[in-house]
Amino acid sequence: MVILIAGSSHTGKTHLAQRLLETLKWPYLSLDHLKMGLIRSGHTQLTPESPDEALTALLWPIAREMAKTAIENGQNLVIEGCYIPYRFREEFPPEYRAQITYVCLVFSQAYLDRHFDQVVAHENCVEQRRNAGVDQTELKLENARHLQACQVLGERFFLIDGPYDAAIQRLCQDLAQETTERGKFSP
């Protein structure tokens, strides 16, 4: 079983993956870690500032095949990052798709208006990262794009509009329940 967690920067993808690790005892792969490993090892000329499209083209094929391998091996894995393409399902056969749960974390525009300072203040709740200089307008645009893409494609999104910790706890519980109710993959 594989859980894919997508969303724009600062929505708490790594935080949710860490909560799922603690709750389900499932390992997770941060696509940011994969990105930095490939960059620092010299396996790509891309940089952390490269366009998301270029980074997705590099990272997603690797993550996709890791997801397939986990499913084939009957293993559980959470993959989180902003480099999961919206049309990821097209790259998996139906029997694999049945073993994938996807959720895109999205802040509502009103939430960002009310809590932008808190969002930035909590950017290091799981990992210590350098201040990214987050722009509120750009973050609102990113979240609106994610919401629209999920709605158009019929993909699951989780709209964060109220107390953050309670929302993430509820989503974590929902995902835990869903994954326990599903069966194992039989190739």
Feature roles, as predicted:
Residues 8:
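P-loop (Walker A) phosphate-binding loop of NTP-binding proteins
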Residues 54-99, 103-107:
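Glycine-rich phosphate-binding loop used to anchor ATP phosphates in small-molecule kinases
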Residues 18-64:
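Conserved substrate/cofactor phosphate-moiety recognition/catalytic segment
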Residues 144-187:
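NTP-dependent small-molecule kinase module
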Residues 11:
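ATP-binding Walker
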